[in-house]
Structures are given as C-alpha cells and as structure tokens.
Amino acid sequence: MKKLSKLRLPLIERELSVLNEEELRAYIGGQKQSCVFNCFDYLDGNLHSANDYYNWTKQGLGYEPDEHGNVDISDVGTIGGYGGFNVSKVNSGESFILRSDGQTSNGERVMAVFAVGSESNEEGHAVVISGFYRTDDERIVYYYYDPTSLCSGSILSDDCDSLYLVKHENPNT
C-alpha cells in the first residue's frame, strides 16, 4: 500500500470542501437530540424526523434542548403540534382506558415522562407506552418503548411524572 507523503495532505485539504457547523448539521442531522423529539418521530411513523421537531422548536419556541436533551415540559403539546399531533396532558386523578396494544380506547398513544438520574441531578426522559399489566397488589406497570435508546422496559405508573395522550390529526399520513 502506498504511503501518502506529508506534502500531499495540504493539497488534499485544499481540494476537499469544508462545511461550517450549520451546513454539517443540515447534511447529517446533527442537531441536539431530545427524547421528546424522538418520541414524536417514532409516533408519526417517520413522517417527520427528530431533526424536523428540533428545527420547529428552535424556530417556533426560540430555544434548543439543553445539553441533556431536555425541553420545557410545558412545550410538549406545542412541539407535538408542529408534527400534526393533538397532545393533551393527563391531569392528576384523570383516567383513561389503555388497551393491551398500548393505545387508548380513542386510538391515542400514551407518552410518559419520568425522572432519571440521582435525586440531586434528576432529568426527565420521555418514552412511548406500549402496554401494561397489574401486579398482585393492583399496582399498574407500564411497558414502554424508548425511541432514544432503542430499547424496551417497564415502569410503575406511580413513577411517571407526566402522561400525555397523543393522536395524529391525520392518521392516514
């Protein structure tokens, strides 16, 4: 194999185009990630990308996720609306019927936000509920899919900080 001499490297560098940070992000989708963006991307069947939700949030709400990917929890409905979702927060004491396929009786999907990390440094994390079961002592455990880490898990309903009912305005898209 031929070895490149150091003299050729400057020539190669001159010939290669250099992208600035904004061009690079647009080209490879390098925007800051957020579990909320990833959940909506997953729920819309890849109609829009997580990068689309990032761009809409930055343009419409004027901010980016923080270094941990967190967005303002009060903006979850607005962010989902950018992608054509009706999003409603489930209030304390409010109930809904969740079928075994993870949808409500009205065809909505459920997005849960729960705390992760140590008590002194908790961050929120959003996942999509995919089902549930009741324990022997009548506690509800949700199965979830995490589009950010591409894994599944389970969590007690009591450990969820917020639940959102999510339905796409045009389910045929």
Predicted feature locations:
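Conserved active-site-adjacent core of cysteine acyl-enzyme catalytic domains
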Residues: 44-48, 53-172
